[in-house]
Structure formats: structure tokens, C-alpha cells
Amino acid sequence: MDIWEKLYLEAKALYAPQEVSDFVYARHVVAAVEAADGQIFTGFCMEGTCGVFHLCAERAALFNMYQQSGQTKVKRIIAFRDKPPYGEGSGMPCGACREFLLELDAENRHLEFMVDYESRKTITLGELMPLWWGEEQARQRENKGNE
């Protein structure tokens, strides 16, 4: 079993779409992240009808990672609905998730997202966001740490 299959199976265990209330639904998108140390953390989405409350599965998994381990660096992420990512975009993160990953740790630009599970095609966050607005500030911080 490769790491992608392991991530897929961990996330798939959470998939169980449900209406939490008349206004909130959850578990229709699931995700698993592999942290820098190899631990796997999972999450599922929750959405409210007012639009203010929306937590993507990727960010839920990242919150779990940080809460449970204090880690900020990610190696891999898989996110999907009822089947593994396929084609050219079914598993791609939204803009808020991309931004959060870079703000959490600029090194996350190297993490891989699963694009097509069957072929194992991946893309890096840096490829998705080549001109991130915070890059200069992140480099300055990295350089201070290396002095």
C-alpha cells in the first residue's frame, strides 16, 4: 500500500454526508494530510447556508494536525467527495485553503495535492500559487532564522 492509498482510506472512512440541522450540512467532502513527520490527520467539511460558516475538509484536517501535534508543514493532501480525485481538478483546494497552507508555513509550497488518484498525478502548491503575495515576507523570516 502506497502513501496515497493510505491517505485515501483514512479520509474515506469519514465520508458520510449528513444534514446537521436545517442550515448546516457536513461530511460531503473529506481530506487527509500527511504531516512532515509522516503522521496522517483527517477532516471533513461543514457548510452553513448563511455563507459565513464554511470549513473545508482540508482546513479541518490542518486544524486537527496543528491541535494534535503542533506541526505546520505538510507533505501531501488528498481531498474528495464520493470517489478519489480524478481528471484535472476534482481534488483541487479552494483559494482559502491554498492561502491558509502558505500562511501556516511557506515551506508548504512544496506539498503535493493528488490530482488523479488512478494515475497518481500530483501538483505542488507552488505550481498552483506561483506568485504568492507573502513570499517576500516569508523569505525574510527564513533568512533571519538562518543568521
Give, region by region, the residue ranges found by the protein language model:
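C-terminal binding/interaction regions
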Residues: D2-S21, F63, Q71-E147
